[in-house]
Amino acid sequence: SFYATGLTDEKMRGQLRGFQASLNEYGDEDKSIPKDWFDAFTRLRKLLEGDKVDREPVNNKTVILLDELPWMDTAKSDFKSALDYFWNSWASAQEDLVLIACGSATSWIITNLLTDKKGFHNRVTRRIHLAPFSLAECEKLFEFNDIVMPRNQMIESYMVFGGIPHYLNLLDQRLSLAQNINELCFKEYGYLHNEYYNLFHSLYDK
């Protein structure tokens, strides 16, 4: 399978440089930066037509995972047009190919993929909505991580971390909930110290 991710606050050339690095990682021997997104997807097609990209062992399909896809679509980059052309001219006809598009900017995904009237119209086969864990699921996660916590503190942790498994996995079983919150959120070098500002900026570009 092939994985590439968009880069925050990078213009077109920076995005293409990142995509080129992914192409090289999966076996593309061309070390030059693609001149545009049409060139980038042409190189991806050639790579996938070869035998360097492994198939998924479960279903024998080739998966293209484009993470933070909206960040790739910078101003005047023609990214969406190139993606449309790649998908409609070749990729959609490959029965063993799956394209997974991810992005924190959900408005872009909705406008350009889910409700698109052009290139991706009626092309989406499945929408994956990743909901936060319920309180019961959080309790199971705590048990799995050997974290002993009374239920009132589980509720408090849910109010702070919102049932997001990635955040809950950061909790240190040796510390109380209050100590964990202090270490993660309020210490200068805490893992989540700047998380609010990072999320706000990525969602609203402010």
Regions found by a protein language model. Give the residues of each.
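Phosphate-binding site recognition
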Residues: 1-206
